[in-house]
């Protein structure tokens, strides 16, 4: 008897929140991170929000140190604590954004994937490709139960 491997080949967390209304840009990005599982509810270590915000605002390729410097400036200007700004954590959060296809690495710099609109990225990369594959596999398991 073959024992199946319980390690997922792909995994995604999606959450539904209230409709957006009169929110700051940072709060909208925070909701996107919460909705796509990049940020956990109640998590105060939200540097991923600032990374995403900075890459969206700058619309250019930035290296890790430039991103980190921009995070420090942004958090200081908004009087937010400097939690989670270690270079290793910034790189880890960039990797998570890359895994969700929002960010791509070009040489040693990062940018929004193909400088594309986020709605298009979500529809093309996550909805049609990533989510479709997961749903198809769940259906395979359901069909096997017949």
Predicted region positions:
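Short alpha-helical segments that sit at the start of domains
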Residues: 14-63
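Short acidic, hydrophobic short linear motifs in intrinsically disordered regions
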Residues: 61-81
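Short, amphipathic alpha-helical interaction segments positioned at domain boundaries
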Residues: 117-146
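Short coil turns linking two alpha-helices in DNA-binding domains
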Residues: 85-86
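A short, conserved structural fragment
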Residues: 95-109
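Basic, amphipathic "hinge/linker" alpha-helix immediately C-terminal to the N-terminal HTH DNA-binding motif
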Residues: 109-119
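Eukaryotic partner-binding/assembly regions in large regulatory complexes
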Residues: 1-16, 125, 129-133
């Amino acid at each position: 008897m073959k024992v199946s491997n319980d390690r997922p080949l792909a995994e995604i967390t999606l959450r539904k929140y209230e409709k957006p209304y009169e929110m700051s840009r940072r709060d909208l990005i925070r909701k996107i991170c919460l909705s796509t599982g990049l940020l956990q509810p109640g998590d105060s270590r939200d540097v991923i929000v600032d990374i995403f915000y900075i890459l969206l605002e700058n619309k250019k390729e930035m290296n890790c140190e430039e991103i980190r410097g921009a995070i420090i400036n942004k958090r200081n200007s908004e009087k937010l604590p400097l939690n989670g700004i270690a270079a290793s954590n910034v790189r880890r959060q960039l990797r998570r954004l890359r895994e969700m296809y929002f960010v791509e690495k070009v040489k040693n710099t990062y940018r929004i994937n193909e400088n594309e609109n986020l709605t298009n990225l979500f529809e093309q990369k996550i909805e049609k490709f990533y989510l479709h594959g997961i749903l198809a596999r769940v259906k395979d398991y359901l069909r096997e139960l017949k």
